[in-house]
Design a protein with these regions (language model features):
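N-terminal intrinsically disordered, low-complexity, charge/repeat-rich segments that act as generic
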Residues: 1-23, 27-28, 37
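Short, conserved turn/kink motifs that form compact alpha/beta structural patches or helix kinks used as
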Residues: 22-136
């Protein structure tokens, strides 16, 4: 029985260990729960709305801690993913197109894309192992 029905795409930003260029790897994760929250934030004496996404990701294979993920050689990244608060993105839904620096910048402007801001690892509990991600 599935608890959640949404798909997300995690975009992991990784600096190539040889060329030092940015590389982007995408992983589609299924059976996630997405909740959207709209908040206000003061900016230059005005109130602006800010969208936050709270995403619950049930345990799925291939996850590595950000530290372990970034130590992997490029040829071992296939099938691996992480949740890093530095430059990683969450796309609501499935995204399978190739990503380069220009596409990454365009993705940042989309309403259905958020930068990972916090991660709560709940995979050591006996029931409902999951990660809770806040993206903005």
């Amino acid at each position: 029985m599935r608890l959640f029905a949404s798909k997300i795409t995690v975009i992991n930003a990784h600096r190539d260990t040889i060329t030092k260029e940015m590389m982007y790897f995408s992983t589609v994760l299924k059976d996630c729960m997405i909740r959207k929250k709209v908040d206000t934030a003061p900016t230059n004496n005005t109130l602006n709305t800010v969208d936050y996404y709270s995403i619950t990701i049930p345990y799925q294979d291939g996850y590595l801690s950000p530290y372990d993920y970034h130590r992997l050689p490029n040829d071992q990244m296939s099938g691996k993913w992480t949740l890093d608060t530095e430059e990683d993105l969450i796309i609501l839904g499935e995204y399978t197109e190739p990503i380069d620096n220009d596409i990454y910048v365009k993705l940042l402007k989309r309403d259905d894309v958020g930068v990972i801001r916090s991660v709560s690892d709940n995979t050591t509990v006996p029931l409902l192992k999951h990660w809770r991600v806040i993206a903005k």
